[in-house]
């Protein structure tokens, strides 16, 4: 006789996750559930939902690193439970951050003696780094104005209209007027002469970008420095420069070592760089470096001792993980100058492959420059039939995430697509992307043209009345719908026609 018994609902170990009750209901969206669920079910359900995310390696919109060596992944996981602010408890982690600051400062040609410690701090990204640099400029300007008995209520900062949104955040959050140099067609970075013309006695600094988000172009920091030196001599001001090198800070020293953009220029007082971009670390690490101690006002530095020892701190947040700092140190010593140079050269070569492939199609204008961040920004030569947004949308069907966007003022009428070439974007992928873009263009060519539809839907019939006068008769909504249906039926029928074996 076979004995059997019913399995209780609590005996979940015998159930497949997909045979359990946990996949029969929707996941909580607003309130925490009353009851627990097995760890296997929680993992499987969340993992399944995450499958709908894009593939990070094919996310060509992002500058952020999406691949690191397995050895570094191990270091990250082994330190993921360390809180960086516990400096007394994790002194080696603090030492690694200080080493990173020193290495990056020397990379940017900071005027340091051989054993002198650099002034800088690790952040969660360039946005926080820019906030800190901006606060230092504002406080220095305020202190100088107060000493001169002048008002301090109207600080401003001069940037190009192509700056990343974090500059707008800084201006709004910390009550600084943002004075933007407008762009123009064919010139998508800040014009140094226009920027200097905007400078007045209330300008806390001029921000230059080494690697525009829009097209990767390096702004002419040296020309800006030279023009600003002359203006400072004429006016008696001492307006400084901050370089936003979020993208280009780990590129220029290796690909363009002779380019003067950093602390070699006397008015450059601080530089930020994203470790999680071309510093080759996963998201969550940035750096800001000051020229010397005098450029970071002491009153902005806090000293705390409730974690076991006196700790100076200058950050906008408090707790943060240590793993990204450790990963940055790994990359700096693992790759060295040789390794970073090889990576950046590979990125540039793959950028050239992609750019030349797009040029051969004769369908696109290349908006990006040869010298700059390794990316390709391009726009349609003829957008009367189809748009860059349609190309971006259709590329997702092949797995590619390629952003389309309009330029800032006064070039809003220009729309571009942008492909960022990262370390893990190989030549094979570049060639494959060109093939898929050509496929998309052929598919779009087969679609009813936007212009043709506009003409057909807005078409008007002309008829003669009894007095031989021409009377215009507009199509009804039903007629327009019939035209659309007829057009799509023809399109579908043509798509079904084949010649040979499918």
From Swiss-Prot:
It comes from the Eukaryota. It is an enzyme of class 4 (lyase). Its cofactor is pyridoxal 5'-phosphate. It catalyses: L-glutamate + H(+) = 4-aminobutanoate + CO2. GO terms for molecular function: calmodulin binding; glutamate decarboxylase activity; molecular adaptor activity; pyridoxal phosphate binding. GO terms for biological process: glutamate metabolic process. The record marks 496-497 as: Anchoring site for calmodulin binding. Expressed in roots. Detected at low levels in shoots of young seedlings. Not detected in the root tips or in the central vascular bundle in the elongating region of mature roots. Induction: Down-regulated by salt treatment. Not induced by hypoxia. Its EC number is 4.1.1.15. Residues 469-502 are annotated as: Calmodulin-binding. InterPro entries: Glutamate_decarboxylase, PyrdxlP-dep_de-COase, PyrdxlP-dep_Trfase, PyrdxlP-dep_Trfase_major. Optimum pH is 6.0. Belongs to the group II decarboxylase family. Catalyzes the conversion of glutamate to 4-aminobutanoate (GABA). The calmodulin-binding is calcium-dependent and it is proposed to directly or indirectly form a calcium regulated control of GABA biosynthesis. Homohexamer. Interacts with calmodulin with a 1:3 stoichiometry. PANTHER family: GLUTAMATE DECARBOXYLASE (PTHR43321), GLUTAMATE DECARBOXYLASE 1 (PTHR43321:SF34). This is Glutamate decarboxylase 1. It comes from Arabidopsis thaliana (Mouse-ear cress).
């Amino acid at each position: 006789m076979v004995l059997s018994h019913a399995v209780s609902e609590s005996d979940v170990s015998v159930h497949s996750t997909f045979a359990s009750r946990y996949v029969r209901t929707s996941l909580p969206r607003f309130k925490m559930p009353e009851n627990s669920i097995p760890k296997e079910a929680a993992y499987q359900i969340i993992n399944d939902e995450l499958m709908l995310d894009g593939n990070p390696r094919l996310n060509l919109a992002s500058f952020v690193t999406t691949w690191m060596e397995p050895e570094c992944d191990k270091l990250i996981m082994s330190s993921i439970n360390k809180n960086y602010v516990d400096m007394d408890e994790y002194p080696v982690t603090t030492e690694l951050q200080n080493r990173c600051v020193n290495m990056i400062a020397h990379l940017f040609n900071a005027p340091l003696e051989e054993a002198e410690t650099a002034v800088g701090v690790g952040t969660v990204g360039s946005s926080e780094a820019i906030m800190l640099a901006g606060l230092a400029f504002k406080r220095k300007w305020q202190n100088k104005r107060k000493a001169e008995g002048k008002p301090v209520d109207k600080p401003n900062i001069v940037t190009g209209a192509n700056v990343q949104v974090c500059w707008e955040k800084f201006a709004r959050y910390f009550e600084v007027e943002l004075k933007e140099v407008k762009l123009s067609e064919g010139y998508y970075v800040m014009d140094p002469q226009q920027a200097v013309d905007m400078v007045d006695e209330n300008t806390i600094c001029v921000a230059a970008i080494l690697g525009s988000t829009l097209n990767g172009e390096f702004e002419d920091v040296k020309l800006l420095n030279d023009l600003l030196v002359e203006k400072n001599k004429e006016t008696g001001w001492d307006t400084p420069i901050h370089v936003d090198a979020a993208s280009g800070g780990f590129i220029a020293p290796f690909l363009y070592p002779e380019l003067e953009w950093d602390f070699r220029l006397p008015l450059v007082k601080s530089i930020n760089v994203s470790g999680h971009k071309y510093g080759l670390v996963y998201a969550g690490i940035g750096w800001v470096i000051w020229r010397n101690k005098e450029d970071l006002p002491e009153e902005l530095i806090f000293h705390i001792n409730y974690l076991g020892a006196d700790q100076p701190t200058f950050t906008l947040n408090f707790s943060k993980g240590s793993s990204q700092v450790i990963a940055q140190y790994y990359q700096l010593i693992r790759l060295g100058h040789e390794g970073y140079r090889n990576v950046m050269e590979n990125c540039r070569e793959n950028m050239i492959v992609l750019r030349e492939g797009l040029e051969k199609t004769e369908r696109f204008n290349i908006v990006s420059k040869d010298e700059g961040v390794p990316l390709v920004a391009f726009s349609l030569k003829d957008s009367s039939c189809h748009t860059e947004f349609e190309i971006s949308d259709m590329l997702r069907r092949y797995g590619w995430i390629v952003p389309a966007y309009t330029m800032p003022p006064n070039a809003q009428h220009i729309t571009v697509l942008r492909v960022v070439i990262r370390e893990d974007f190989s030549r094979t992928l570049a060639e494959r992307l060109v093939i898929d873009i050509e496929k998309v263009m052929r598919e779009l060519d087969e679609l009813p043209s936007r212009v043709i539809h506009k003409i057909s839907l807005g078409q008007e019939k002309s008829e003669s009345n009894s007095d031989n006068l021409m009377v215009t008769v507009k199509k009804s909504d039903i007629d327009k719908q019939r035209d659309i249906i007829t057009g799509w039926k023809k399109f579908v029928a043509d798509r079904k026609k084949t010649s040979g074996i499918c």
